[in-house]
From Swiss-Prot:
Lineage: Eukaryota, Fungi, Dikarya, Ascomycota, Saccharomycotina
Family: Belongs to the SBE2 family.
Biological process according to GO: fungal-type cell wall organization; protein transport
Major location category of this protein: Golgi
Comp. bias regions, Low complexity: 20-36, 60-74
Domain of life: Eukaryota
Physiological role: With SBE22, is involved in cell wall integrity and polarity processes like bud growth.
Keyword Nucleotidyltransferase in record: no
The name this protein goes by in its record: Protein SBE2
Length: 821
């Protein structure tokens, strides 16, 4: 290592102080570490560094002469280049300009109005704004287009170009008119102050100074600083040239220079660079050109412009960093775009890719290859698709169709898909509801029959909210109300179902009892009905089921007429004798009596057929001329027996037996007296309710009104009532032939008082049952005779329930009140 010489004040050491290898390495390291700060941006410099350009201009002509001499000397004697370092070992002794004179009128501005705007500071000319907005510079654009070389050209009649490979340092200048060193340095400093368009890249750093149109004519110097090197290369001696600049350069001017001149200049420069390599290491400016004392932006005091303030320098540095970042992003985007491209043969068929989101037709960067003019054949793929499904469609942006046509077809296809799916869903829903219509509740079916509901339009949601307690065409109930009503309905239905089960059970049991009692009757007849034990069973059977039609006449005759037929043979008239009297003596039949008979038949509340009517009239004629004459109830007894199908002889016999035993005069008198007894059973029940106060009267409660009750019951119930009355009027006795001889001379009144049972209680209990349980639609028993013939005391609740159940209920209630007597 050679020790550095001490240098005087105001002087700069030459390159001879440092060896060539060390000098080259120092220049390279300095270039890599701080060149981006000193040359590119013009910041972080000391004031003394501004002297470099002044000294460089002073030695411009001398350097050119030395370069020519060195070239000639190397041509004749290549070995003489070794002494060049000793000849150039001298000190630059130019005095720097007076700093006080420069900064007299360049104080820092005190307001924002005096500060240059960003547009003034950061733009060289009007043409550079477009490049700055894109984050690029003239040199950057030139680098993007060429990628291998860097070119700098100035046009002013003569063109000089310095083209070097990437990684070299170059500084070129084209000179038009010779000027003094001092003036050229001054002009250069003035022009350097207009440096604004500066670009950074990863490989190079360039500073370009162009003459502003408003500058004076004398300041026509242009400096181009190219510092791309980070490879340790030295600067060529001819890299610093001062020329007179022609008009402003633009991006197009760089690319439109004379190719011949540029190639020739490039060849000359290459030869010169190769010959001057040893001299470069010993040149006085080789080490001082890129020293830390060299300013990138000289002071603007010479041309009357203010220097950059710290804030302006900060804004300049921030703008340069932003441009550098934009340039880096652009380079990376281009890299990834290149990497993302696919070969032309690897692209898929557009007809098979239709559901992938794509860009609009204006995006031409999607594909670089030329597409086919014809539309791809999709016939083969279309055969596999449904006509209503989404057909294949071209990728937007790569087919020769407009956006409107593409989206119209897509809209039609989507509409067709939606309409078809909607039609299929509707069809399936209607089919499902049609098949499930039979499973809907009865409320919907009844409403459909009435025209209030369409079963096809009943959905599951409607079925879930519709309640059976309200018609389906009305608004649905509230949730709580529906739950409460459904709970009550379930309770009522459960009770009704229980009652229905009980009714069915009772009906079944009644049928069993009916069969059992019929068999018991056969046994009782065989054993004898007038026995005391037999009569108890007979009464029980009468209250439970009644007598059968086949054995009813026999039971009546045996119980009421005794085993020897005493009443019918001794106290009743013979029908043959009565018929002879009518034919012999009463032809024609007396009109007064006949009118009375017709009235009895007409007042009956039963429809009477003509055949039954003639028989009934004949029976009534016999009864009218008989010993006891016509009595209350004869017409009803004879009519119901006729309905049973008995012959006239049997009917005559049974009707007279009932009138002489069950409804005789003693029974009628006791009925009238007991029913009006206020202390009796009927009186006590009627006094409990004040509504019966008016009805408790002899006009309404008598034997005549009793038959009004029997006239308002059905035939089956009437016969059942007669069975009970006959059974309750039966008497247990053993009739013998001796008793028969003793009764031969006994009249009817004596026989009645001695051997006939008088049971008025069964009749009074029947009237009480009607008054208390079936008092509906009439005011009193006398009013019953005035009601229409269709009125019945006991009738079925509905048509689905058999009336026999109501008859059974009537008999049970009657038995209940009969037990009170």
């Amino acid at each position: 290592m050679v020790a550095a010489r001490p240098r005087k004040a105001g002087t700069y050491p030459t390159t001879a102080q440092v060896p060539s290898s060390a000098n080259a390495s120092s220049i390279s390291s300095y270039t890599n570490s701080s060149n981006s700060k000193t040359v590119g941006s013009g910041i972080t410099r000391r004031p003394s560094e501004n002297m470099l350009l002044n000294m460089a201009e002073g030695k411009q002509s001398q350097n050119q002469n030395q370069q020519q001499q060195q070239q000639q000397h190397q041509t004749h004697n290549p070995r003489s280049s070794a002494n060049g370092s000793e000849e150039s070992d001298h000190v630059l002794s130019f005095k720097p300009p007076n700093r006080k004179a420069v900064l007299i009128k360049n104080e820092r501005p005190i307001s924002n109005d005096s500060i240059n705007t960003e547009g003034d500071v950061f733009s060289i000319n009007a043409g550079s704004s477009k490049d700055s907005s894109r984050g690029t510079s003239i040199i950057d654009d030139d680098d993007d287009e060429n990628h291998d070389t860097e070119q700098s050209a100035v046009l002013d009649g003569k063109v000089s170009a310095n083209v070097m490979p990437r990684g070299k340092k170059s500084f070129s200048s084209v000179k038009q008119n010779p000027v003094t060193p001092h003036s050229s340095v001054t002009d250069g400093l003035d022009d350097v102050s207009h440096l604004t368009d500066t670009s950074f890249s990863d490989a190079d750093l360039s500073v370009t100074t162009v003459k502003v149109a408003s500058a004076p004519k004398s300041m026509n110097t242009k400096y181009i600083f190219n510092n791309p090197g980070s490879q340790g290369k030295s600067v060529a001696p001819d890299a610093f040239q001062s020329v007179d600049s022609s008009p402003k350069l633009t991006r197009s001017m760089f690319s439109t220079v004379n190719p011949t001149a540029m190639h020739s200049s490039y060849d000359q420069h290459s030869q010169l660079h190769g010959q001057s390599q040893p001299l470069h290491n010993t040149h006085p400016l080789a080490t001082s050109l890129h020293s830390k004392s060299v300013p990138a932006l000289p002071s603007d005091s010479l041309n009357g412009k203010k220097p950059l303030t710290p804030s302006q320098r900060y804004r300049l540095r921030r703008e340069q960093n932003k441009l550098h970042l934009q340039h880096s992003i652009k380079q990376k985007e281009l890299f990834y775009d290149e990497d993302a491209k696919l070969p032309a043969n690897d692209l898929l068929d557009e007809s098979l890719v239709w559901s992938i989101p794509t860009a609009s037709h204006s995006s031409t960067f999607i594909s670089q290859r030329k597409h086919r003019a014809s539309v791809p054949n999709v016939g083969r793929s279309a055969k596999l698709l449904d006509g209503h499904d989404m057909p294949p469609s071209p990728i937007p942006g790569v087919q020769k169709v407009s956006d409107l046509e593409y989206f119209q077809q897509v809209g039609k296809n989507l509409s067709a898909v939606y309409q078809k799916s909607e039609y299929e869903v509707t069809k399936s829903k209607l089919l499902e509801r049609t098949q499930s219509a039979e499973l809907l509740p009865l409320d919907f079916k009844n409403a459909s029959v009435e025209g209030m509901e369409d079963l096809k339009l009943v959905s599951d949601d409607k079925v879930s909210i519709i309640s059976s307690t309200r018609p389906c065409w009305l608004p649905p109930k509230d949730t709580e109300e529906r739950r409460s009503h459904e709970r009550d309905v379930r309770k009522t239905l459960s009770m009704a179902s229980i009652e229905k089960l009980e009714t069915n059970q009772r009906r079944h049991e009644q049928e069993i009892k009916n069969e059992t009692n019929n068999q018991k009757l056969v046994l009782l007849i065989d054993r004898g009905l007038n026995r005391k034990s037999s009569l108890q069973d007979l009464k029980k059977i009468a209250w439970e089921t009644g007598f059968s039609s086949a054995r009813r006449s026999f039971i009546y005759n045996t119980v009421l007429n005794t085993d020897f037929n005493i009443i019918s043979t001794k106290y009743m008239d013979d029908t043959s004798s009565l018929d002879n009297i009518i034919r012999s003596k009463m032809t024609p039949f007396p009109s007064t009596q006949m009118a009375e008979i017709n009235k009895l038949v007409d007042d009956m509340h039963f429809p009477v057929e003509s055949q039954i009517r003639s028989k009934l009239i004949k029976l009534l004629q016999w009864k009218s001329i008989s010993r006891f004459g016509l009595q209350t109830g004869d017409n009803y007894l004879m009519l119901h027996f006729l309905l049973e199908g008995y012959d006239l002889e049997l009917i005559w016999k049974l009707a007279n037996l009932l009138q002489l035993t069950c409804f005789n005069s003693i029974t009628r008198d006791k009925y009238d007296n007991r029913i009006m007894n206020r202390d009796g059973v009927v009186g006590r029940y009627m006094r409990k309710d004040s509504a019966f106060a008016e009805e408790f009267d002899s006009r309404y409660l008598n034997y005549m009104t009793f038959w009004n009750c029997l006239a308002r019951v059905d035939h089956d119930l009437f016969i059942w009532i007669m069975d009970i009355i006959v059974a309750e009027n039966a008497r247990a006795s053993r009739w013998t032939e001796e008793w028969q001889h003793q009764l031969r001379n006994t009249d009817w009144d004596t026989f009645k008082e001695k051997y006939i049972v008088v049971n008025y209680k069964v009749l009074c209990s029947l009237s009480l049952n009607v008054l208390l349980r079936y008092h509906f639609g009439w005011n009193n028993l006398l009013h019953l005779d005035e009601l229409p013939p269709s009125f019945q005391l006991v009738k079925p609740v509905d048509n689905r329930e058999p009336v026999s159940d109501q008859y059974l209920v009537f008999i049970k209630k009657w038995n209940h009140y009969y037990a009170k007597f």
